[in-house]
UniProtKB/Swiss-Prot annotation:
Keywords: Repeat, Ribonucleoprotein, Ribosomal protein, WD repeat. This is Small ribosomal subunit protein RACK1. Involved in the recruitment, assembly and/or regulation of a variety of signaling molecules. Interacts with a wide variety of proteins and plays a role in many cellular processes. InterPro entries: G-protein_beta_WD-40_rep (IPR020472), RACK1-like (IPR045223), WD40/YVTN_repeat-like_dom_sf (IPR015943), WD40_repeat_CS (IPR019775), WD40_repeat_dom_sf (IPR036322), WD40_rpt (IPR001680). It holds the Pfam family WD40. Interacts with the 80S ribosome. GO terms for biological process: cellular response to starvation; cuticle development; cytoplasmic translation; egg-laying behavior; IRES-dependent viral translational initiation; locomotory behavior; mitophagy; muscle cell cellular homeostasis. WD repeats lie at residues 13-44, 62-92, 104-134, 147-179, 191-221, 232-261, 282-312. Belongs to the WD repeat G protein beta family. Ribosomal protein RACK1 subfamily. PANTHER family: RECEPTOR FOR ACTIVATED PROTEIN KINASE C RACK1. SMART domains: WD40. It comes from the Eukaryota. It comes from Drosophila melanogaster.
């Protein structure tokens, strides 16, 4: 028996690149997505076999430029977004309204995250800083000492309460690990030879993976700071995510998604949508964002053709 992924449907409604997707830990029938069309969409998942996999239940307006990132609070009631309009916004999803605007970055906000307890917020920006905020939109700390020397492309909290850290990466080719208690640098991870787009922390907080221009996914041990190993790809890595319940890493590179079984470092599946267009690489929609459902059975992927594609894990007898 082996596990494969089948394309189950699409979510159509954005008018710009789908830059990020967040699944709702409390409600398996809704997800939220961010786009270059300056909106967030809350999707109701209907899982229709023939037509769309769901429909836009709510569209959230407020940002005045591309939205680069979105995350959900652990209770699923609030969304946090970051935008090229230099702000973050906290949204009450039931009301469909912004409850807080976070101002302080001097350039585009590229990444946002919630701490495990939802009390702290971190953001990364093209202004080369990382900012820590509370949920009242007060900036508590700006990390500049030992900071990135170029755009901060991604910031993430570790889900591990016993090791409170922030992981960041940037266009300076560096992955940095920060001690959350004092906002001081804990580790620098060097090994990439191109700008970095994304970093993600494993569900148990023991390791992280980074990727970008050099097409390599590097895995790092967050406890001792060592580079564990490298997974090679043949295109720019745009997104990374760990499965919540299997030892899998998903890598979005160029138009493709590769799912790695980290136990044996072998490919489980390679996903590439069949897009009806001339087969030149330039015309293939790029995969920009990835998110697993909480149960690890459904993979949502956002693309540069404004579409979300939905894959489902199925067991096949070989």
């Amino acid at each position: 028996m082996s596990e494969t992924l089948q394309l189950r449907g699409t979510l159509i409604g954005h008018n710009g690149w789908v830059t990020q997707i967040a699944t709702n830990p409390k409600d398996p029938d809704t997800i939220i997505s961010a786009s270059r069309d300056k909106t967030l969409i809350v999707w109701k998942l209907t899982r229709d076999e023939d037509t769309n996999y769901g429909y836009p239940q709510k569209r959230l307006y407020g940002h005045s430029h591309f939205i680069s990132d979105v995350v959900l609070s652990s209770d699923g009631n609030y969304a946090l977004s970051g935008s090229w309009d230099q702000t973050l916004r906290l949204w009450d999803l039931a009301a469909g309204k912004t409850t807080r605007r976070f101002e302080g970055h001097t350039k585009d906000v590229l990444s946002v995250a919630f701490s495990a307890d939802n009390r702290q917020i971190v953001s990364g920006s093209r202004d080369k800083t990382i900012k820590l905020w509370n949920t009242l939109a007060e900036c508590k700390f700006t990390i500049q000492e030992d900071g990135h020397t170029d755009w901060v492309s991604c910031v993430r909290f570790s889900p591990n309460h016993s090791n409170p850290i922030i992981v960041s990466c940037g266009w300076d080719r560096t992955v940095k690990v920060w001690n959350l208690a004092n906002c001081k640098l804990k580790n620098n991870h060097h090994g990439h030879n191109g700008y970095l787009n994304t970093v993600t922390v494993s569900p148990d907080g023991s390791l992280c993976t980074s990727g970008g221009k050099d097409s390599k996914a590097l895995l790092w041990d967050l406890n001792d700071g060592k580079n564990l190993y490298t997974l090679e790809h043949n295109d720019i890595i745009n997104a990374l995510c760990f499965s919540p319940n299997r030892y899998w890493l998903c890598v979005a590179y160029g138009p493709s998604i590769k799912i790695w079984d980290l136990a044996c470092k072998k490919t489980v599946e390679e996903l590439r949508p069949e897009v009806v267009s001339p087969t030149s690489k330039a015309d293939q929609p790029q995969c920009l964002s990835l998110a697993w459902s909480t149960d690890g059975q459904t993979l949502f992927a956002g693309y540069s053709d404004n579409t979300i594609r939905v894959w489902q894990v199925s067991v096949s007898a070989h």
